Amino acid sequence: MAREYKIEDYRNFGIMAHIDAGKTTMTERILFYTGKNHKIGETHDGASTMDWMEQEQERGITITSAATTTFWQGRDGKKRRFNIIDTPGHVDFTIEVERSLRVLDGAIALLDANAGVEPQTETVWRQAEKYHVPRMVFVNKMDKIGADFYRSVEMVGSRLGAVALPVQLPIGAENDFVGVVDLIEMKALTWDGTIGAPATVGEIPADMADKAEEYREKLIELAVEIDEAAMEAYLEGTMPTNDELRALIRKGTIEVKFHPILCGTAFKNRGVQPLLDAVVEFLPAPTDVPAIKGIDVKTETETTRESSDEAPLSMLAFKIMNDPFVGSLTFARIYSGKLTKGVSLENTVKGKRERIGRMLQMHSNSREDIDEAFAGDIVALAGLKETTTGDTLCDPLKPVILERMEFPDPVIEIAIEPKTKADQEKMGIALNRLAAEDPSFRVKSDEESGQTIIAGMGELHLDILVDRMKREFKVEANVGAPQVAYRESITRAAEIDYTHKKQSGGSGQFARVKIIFEPHDGDDFIFESKIVGGSVPKEYIPGVQKGIESVMGAGPLAGFPMLGVKATLIDGAYHDVDSSVLAFEIASRAAFREGAQKAGAQLLEPIMKVEVVTPEDYVGDVIGDLNSRRGQISGTEARGIAAVVNAMVPLANMFGYVNSLRSMSQGRAQYTMQFDHYEPVPTAVAQEIQKKFA
């Protein structure tokens, strides 16, 4: 089966929005209009629209899938294939938001016409900026009381520091909003509001003619700046044709020089079709964006994969979801090559092979089994055993790693228990599923207390996961107070000579070890043996190492795992009859306990790299507050019109920060934090911790 749509006719995009900007309604409408459009060629009696509507009403279709494939016939009469990728609403999952931004080629940012640019929009916008994602803006809810298109456009400049390029103007507002002026064609498009109705094209209302002329002039001035030849022609008095103007807007959008702005109301079915036309005209195809970079596994050098079916196969798993009918589904974006059912691929991150069994294409109201897929496609793969989010699957002969996902170790832990005994098993299953989906979340059980401990990247991260457990898996749980994952280390070298002797009738136990314990720069444990002349026989030396490792998990101060210790076995003695591996294990264990005390044990705490993005007005308050949390400011910089404050702050002092920052900045600042390194805890604080845990 050959490729049905050329890769140039693909649009992989997402809808970014603040929680209440109307993302669900907009997505439903897009699926409805594109779905209906897809059905047109199949029935000639007009019944399909009605069936589809009844089905939509019955099921209240919402896009629950991580990616949905649909089709749209553009203004030029040619059909395009859309893959709509869901961007998570929760900005705290920086890893997830960034991964979805990574697999999109373009995005639509939805604004609420009443609220304009809201804090969450700022956050996602800045992340998209980091990945250089081309974006358009749709000012939604134009029918709402207080809707103000021009204020929203102004906020795109003032709050996001972005260049706004209105390609439409609204006709009326609030209850009187009926349609838009198309500034490229210079026509008025109005809708009567019934679902699925096409626009009525007419002349621009007389009272808007001057404004439309003024905005069209601004549009042309901005657009011609993108291209020298167009700029020269314009300065000599030659206006671009409408098609040339569209091409210039496309070029500027893909180069992220400006952002086309459209408007409408998804709920009242006004303005949706022109938005879909704009996706075709202004957002990039996979071939319009730079080739994806990766690491060539064989040579360890950087390489790229072109968006072409002829290139070696490479794909990125970006989301794992549970499907009630199919079980676990791995969503992957194919960047290059062609995928056929039944092939065996290499997971280069895990170093394992995966066989591709069932492949699905998700449509808004159905799932379709497919046998092959091509560059630019987004597929759902059922039954993969080894693959988790962020992994690369590729041709085993041309191995590549597309994304070296560095998942930081969790820094915050909480104990969790099911509310009822009946939920015990369900909770275990739920936690394991969530851990498979989110590599920055871990589950373990505490050997001493028998409690289940979950660990993650921050308070909100764990809150949301506990909430998902309740919503998706119907498991209610009680959660303890968050704990910092402290560590212990040593500060100087100590030499210990320890003899273990036990005589109680029959064969006894005997082992003598002489070990130097000293700190080293890494986090790991290093063991070295300098035994010469057989004072400790070779077969007993692994016992010495095992003994030390067995007690490294609980340091002498407060029982936290130890980091950065080097142990060197320099001498010892044994007995022909009474010595054994076990005897040397016991001796080295005791030697380490004594050595850790003598070598100046100290407590370490996780230090977080914190980045706060805030409007200028609040910088002073933000810095003062971080200083009061034992933070060290490492610098401030301007990003667009916002200020960025970078700091290193102990995790123990970051609890509850999200609320403090919100009230300090009226909800306009946001922050991200990730683990950076461990540092010694100040003496006064260390004493408190020891009292609590020892």
UniProtKB/Swiss-Prot annotation:
Keyword annotations of the record: Cytoplasm, Elongation factor, GTP-binding, Nucleotide-binding, Protein biosynthesis
Protein name: Elongation factor G
SUPFAM superfamilies: EF-G C-terminal domain-like, P-loop containing nucleoside triphosphate hydrolases, Ribosomal protein S5 domain 2-like, Translation proteins
Annotated source species: Brucella abortus (strain 2308)
Gene it is expressed from: fusA
Domain tr-type G residues, every copy: 8-287
GO BP term, example: ribosome disassembly
SMART domains recorded: EFG_C, EFG_IV
Residues binding GTP: 17-24, 86-90, 140-143
Listed HAMAP family: EF_G_EF_2_B
Keyword Cytoplasm recorded: yes
Family: Belongs to the TRAFAC class translation factor GTPase superfamily. Classic translation factor GTPase family. EF-G/EF-2 subfamily.
